Regions:
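Long amphipathic alpha-helical coiled-coil/heptad-repeat bundle
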Residues: 2-520
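Short, conserved catalytic/metal-binding motifs centered on acidic residues
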Residues: 62, 623-627, 677-683, 752-757
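Structured, charged N-terminal subsegments at the starts of enzyme catalytic cores
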Residues: 524-629
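Active-site cores of enzymes that catalyze phosphoryl transfer or operate on phosphate-rich substrates
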Residues: 584, 591-594, 602, 664-732
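Electropositive nucleic-acid engagement tracts
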Residues: 601-602, 618-676
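Short, basic/hydrophobic alpha-helical segments
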Residues: 729-750
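Acidic, metal-coordinating catalytic cores used for nucleic-acid/nucleotide bond scission
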Residues: 751-762, 779-785
Length: 996
């Protein structure tokens, strides 16, 4: 029986073939003087060229040139130039296979290369096992083996043997992981784990299925449901430390595999595998339920405040008519009194003319009942929500263990006291109850003349706990999301090791004195320059008069001729169904190979079924309706393919491949240089079951929803997307997309643009630390204050805009902390959004958050000065953000079904919707980019196409793409590797384009 191939043809080529890019060829195939001397001893040009190429192949990738193999022309040309022969002479060498075999044997001996054999394979298998415990991806394991072969001087094995070795080692690694997870489990623990697959009493549902149904809506019943499930998990008594015996990504993979398998299948696993999977599920559910409980806690307390504020506002509105009547009455009385005084009249008689005295006295008493405190404090009605909070709060406090920084000690004592009172059924607070945590706004409600108000005290404890959890001052044992701030960062010891070795991975001078002196010189000079130009009226489209900043808005820069050209080009693009477009793009890029099976690593057996699943996500159609609208798969087939092949990491790999292909298209260089990007959030309403898991942002109206936050390159490639709450700050997520896309090496001086939602001083600071130029379009710039090192009076024109001096001492005191935060983000120890969320939630007196904000003020001031002085920067920012808005219009058109609403309840399904949408949008952009290039070429054959107009072209059009109807594939439309053909263009419209 033949070996079943798992690695795709493209993956094998990447592993075994020489590089074809110029940089890779130079790196691997530059010959030394000794190499040239040996090669020149060959007989004839063809022998010398063949010998040189064989030498190159044996060094990298580490195998001989095969019989019948024709090397890449770029490689042949590069080597031929070095040995001073013609590339065409290779043909004579390749026709005589005896020369190839003889050269291969001689060079293997010269280089000391060993052949692949059973002993070598066994040694490499033992070596690979450690890596297989870290990653399960077959292509990654194969790449590691080949790299080790090169290091050990071993000839690369045939692809089939390499696959077999990796599969065997992967199986060994899985068995080892199962052993580590189950070793030491008691008989009672094993019995309780097995009970998870049994049915619950009087139901047809298993315990495991019930545990997986985690309540999402912010209701007291949901909180109690989460706590009930968590107590059931804790009763199994699996030590969380057991999960640290294996790599966390492998633990997560076990959980994902089990999540795509029925409970009956899990119950049928052999004993050790079954207990390992159930242990992994137990550990994962414990953390997920803990995080969900804290999330519900935050939402329930937040809802309490919103309801109180809403009730307060409604009451005020209800009293508005009475208040208005009183104001009008007192205005008349005031006018009568003023007239009486002017005419030396009797003021009381004047009042009687307006309203009888007795009635006037009544209106005064009525007015007193309408009077409210100046701040209209909604806390006055919070106590009315106490009964609802008590439905779940005692169980919540009893279930979780909270720990905190020393500053939260008073709050920790208060929680412990309430926990004890709830347990004992006590209703009266002791006189010694901790109150140091009570903030001034709460004090007048909590600390009354009659003592401590129990209701307000408990509400204050919960509100303060919510704020401290968000800030990271308090953390929860067993939580992933709500961990201690220190635990999220790279350790101080590791940071010191990095500093002593190769240096920490930040983009600025790490010596603070040198850093701040450079910034001081720079900022002083820029302030002086801009101040002088502003004083002389030399800032283009900018005036500063009496401290008031005015900037002339950017005018539309796209000429009508460019719009006409775009319309003509799009009119020639072939009309195409979205199914055919996706098939064609898959043929160009092979992106479907990225959607590998979760367990086996194999590509999908039927690409059409996989594409149907992707379209179900991206078009917002859903699997059920997709099964009805396509003829190639049942709902069961679609669901199986989606469960095992479509997930976050495969979406990310496929998107990266599409983005790379689109960015390499020659036409894409006209859209941008590749050194800039932008990001923006797009709101989608929630419908159906998705409403309970969504939030209301008044900016988008009264309906709940969520946002897809997407990053777009200046070449129109949407390289990252993330689902965020409708109320979430976009600034928290700016850096995540950049870091995920660029990895460890951001392009030098990469400029990133956002609108006002992405702006914060913390983002300015971290962008500078991590090597990005942050260039947002700051709203209400005239109200944003600048900062300086010198006295503001040194810059008289800008002085009204300068709020004060930069606190250098504060930045200096916490410089090591700022470098540690940046290093933790750069190394992937923690995401930027998590750090920024905690820093933003800190009280203003937190020194680290304040120091980062101070650094951000410095960077924002430098940027603002550039913004005022450079109209080109303002135009670029507007242009890049317009690209994002255009992309959002395309996304809105693609996300056409279900009224464009998000109706998924779970966050995982919502993420799949966002990823599927972004993948389809990117595929359309890539398809448009390639076909627009063909359209330009065709148009130039009949008329002049000014290059100045092409700069305004974009690949965002979609009128030619059929996004609705039946989704049809046929056998001859399936994608094939190395597909190169393009569809014929439509006739060119009979119009002439003129240069602007």
């Amino acid at each position: 029986m033949g070996h079943r191939r798992i690695l795709t043809g493209e993956q094998i080529a990447q592993l075994f073939d020489p590089p074809t890019d110029r940089r890779g060829i130079i790196r691997h195939y530059t010959l030394s003087a000794a190499d040239l001397a040996m090669i020149r001893r060959g007989r004839g040009d063809h022998h010398r060229l063949g010998l040189a190429l064989m030498l190159c192949y044996l060094r990298y990738p580490g195998r001989p040139l095969h019989a019948g193999e024709i090397p890449d022309p770029a490689l042949v040309s590069f080597v031929a130039t070095q040995i001073d022969v013609l590339p065409d002479s290779l043909g004579a060498y390749l026709r005589v296979d005896q020369n190839r075999r003889r050269h291969s044997a001689a060079l293997q001996d010269r280089l000391g290369l060993r052949p692949w054999g059973p002993r070598v394979a066994a040694d490499l298998a033992d070596w690979l096992l450690g890596h297989a415990l870290e990653t399960d991806r077959l292509v990654d394991l194969a790449a590691l083996v080949l790299e080790e072969c090169r290091g050990r001087g071993i000839l690369l094995p045939p692809p089939a043997r390499l696959e077999r070795l990796c599969i065997e080692v992967r199986y060994r690694a899985r068995r080892e992981i199962e052993r580590r997870l189950t070793e030491g489990l008691s008989a009672d623990q094993r019995r309780r784990l097995d009970a998870l697959t049994e049915r619950r009493l009087d139901t047809s549902q298993s315990w495991l299925a019930w545990l997986r149904q985690i309540p999402e809506s912010a209701k007291p019943a949901s909180m109690l449901g989460v706590i009930e499930r968590l107590e059931h998990i804790r009763a199994i008594d699996i030590d969380p430390a057991r999960g640290h015996r294996i790599n966390q990504s492998r633990l997560a993979q076990l959980v994902r595999e089990a999540g795509r398998t029925t409970v009956q299948h899990v119950a049928g696993y052999e004993r050790r595998r079954r207990h390992a999977v159930l242990t992994a599920i137990d550990l994962d559910l414990s953390a997920r339920l803990t995080d969900q409980a804290i999330t519900l806690f935050e939402r329930l307390i937040g809802a309490m405040f919103r309801k109180a504020e809403g009730r307060h506002a409604r009451a005020f509105q209800a009293e508005g008519r009475a208040i208005n009547e009183k104001v009008r009455l007192y205005a008349r009385i005031g006018a009568a009194l003023m007239a009486a005084r002017a005419g030396q009249g009797d003021p009381f008689a004047a009042i009687d003319k307006v309203i009888p005295w007795d009635r006037f006295c009544s209106t005064v008493m009525e007015a007193e009942t309408l009077v409210r405190s100046e701040d209209f404090d909604p806390y006055e009605v919070l106590s009315e929500h106490y009964a609802g909070i008590r439905r779940w709060a005692p169980a919540f406090l009893a279930t979780f263990e909270f720990q905190g920084v020393p500053a939260a000690a008073s709050l920790m004592r208060a929680i412990a006291m309430l926990r004890a009172m709830n347990s004992a059924g006590a209703s009266t607070l002791p006189k010694s109850a901790p109150t140091a945590f009570v903030r001034p706004r709460w004090a007048r409600h909590v600390l009354t003349a009659h003592g401590i108000d129990r209701r307000y005290y408990e509400l204050c404890v919960l509100a303060e706990l919510r704020q401290r959890l968000a800030a990271g001052d308090v953390w929860v044992t067993g939580s992933r999301q709500y961990r201690a701030f220190e635990e999220r960062l790279i350790s101080r010891e590791t940071l010191q090791v990095l500093q002593k070795a190769s240096g920490i991975p930040v983009a600025i001078e790490t010596d603070f004195d040198r850093f701040i002196e450079t910034r001081r010189t720079w900022l002083d000079a820029r302030l002086a320059e801009v101040d002088a130009r502003a004083r002389g009226g030399l800032l283009p489209d900018v005036t500063i008069e009496k401290g008031v900043l005015r900037i002339t808005p950017i005018e539309k820069s796209t000429p009508p001729e460019a719009e006409a050209l775009a319309a003509k080009l799009y009119a020639t693009l072939p009309r195409i169904r979205i199914t055919d477009l996706l098939t064609e793009v898959a043929g160009w890029t092979g992106f479907l190979d990225c959607f590998t099976h979760l367990r086996t690593g194999e590509a999908a057996a039927d690409p059409r079924v996989l594409m149907a699943g992707l379209l179900a996500d991206g078009l917002n159609l859903g699997l059920t309706r997709m099964a009805e609208a396509c003829s190639i798969a049942s709902l069961g087939q679609l669901a199986w393919t989606a469960d095992w092949h479509i997930r976050d990491e495969t979406y990310a790999l496929a998107l990266r491949r599409l983005v790379e292909h689109q960015s390499r298209e020659p036409l894409a260089a006209l859209f941008g240089s590749g050194t800039a990007s932008s990001s923006d959030g797009q709101f989608f309403r929630a419908g159906g079951s998705g409403r309970d898991a969504s939030r209301i942002n008044a900016h988008y109206g009264p309906e709940p929803g969520l946002k897809f936050y997407t990053h777009l390159s200046d070449r129109y490639a949407p390289f990252h997307t993330r689902v965020i709450a409708a109320t979430a700050s976009e600034a928290l997520h700016v850096l995540d997309g950049l870091l995920d896309h660029h990895g460890d090496a951001p392009p030098r001086q990469h400029r990133h643009h956002t609108d006002g939602g992405g702006v914060s001083d913390h983002v300015f600071a971290l962008c500078a630390l991590l090597g990005y130029v942050f260039a947002p379009r700051i709203p209400d710039l005239k109200d944003r204050r600048l900062y300086s090192f010198d006295r503001p009076a040194a810059y008289p024109t800008l002085a009204p805009m300068i709020a004060g001096r930069i606190n250098v001492d504060l930045i200096r005191a916490h410089w090591p902390d700022l470098l540690r935060i940046a290093t933790s983000i750069r190394t992937g120890t923690v995401s930027a959004s998590v750090i920024l969320r905690q820093l933003a939630a800190y009280p203003r007196q937190n020194a680290v958050a304040a120091a980062l904000r101070e650094l951000g003020r410095l960077e924002r001031t430098l940027f603002t000065l550039d913004w005022l002085e450079d109209p080109g920067l303002r135009r670029e920012s507007s242009h890049e953000l317009n690209k994002g808005e255009a992309r959002n219009s395309l996304a809105r058109a693609v996300f056409i079904h279900r009224l464009g609403e998000i109706r998924d309840r779970t966050f995982e399904n919502q993420k799949h919707r966002a990823s599927g949408l972004n993948l389809l949008v990117t595929a359309i952009i890539l398809w448009n980019t390639r076909y627009l290039a063909q359209a330009i070429q065709a148009l130039r054959q009949v008329e002049d196409v000014p290059g100045t107009l092409l700069r305004h072209l974009s690949p965002i059009g979609w009128e030619h793409v059929n996004l609705t109807g039946d989704y049809i594939w046929s056998a001859n439309q399936q994608s094939t590797e190395n597909h190169a053909g393009l569809r014929p263009l439509r006739p060119i419209p009979d119009t002439t384009i003129k240069a602007a």
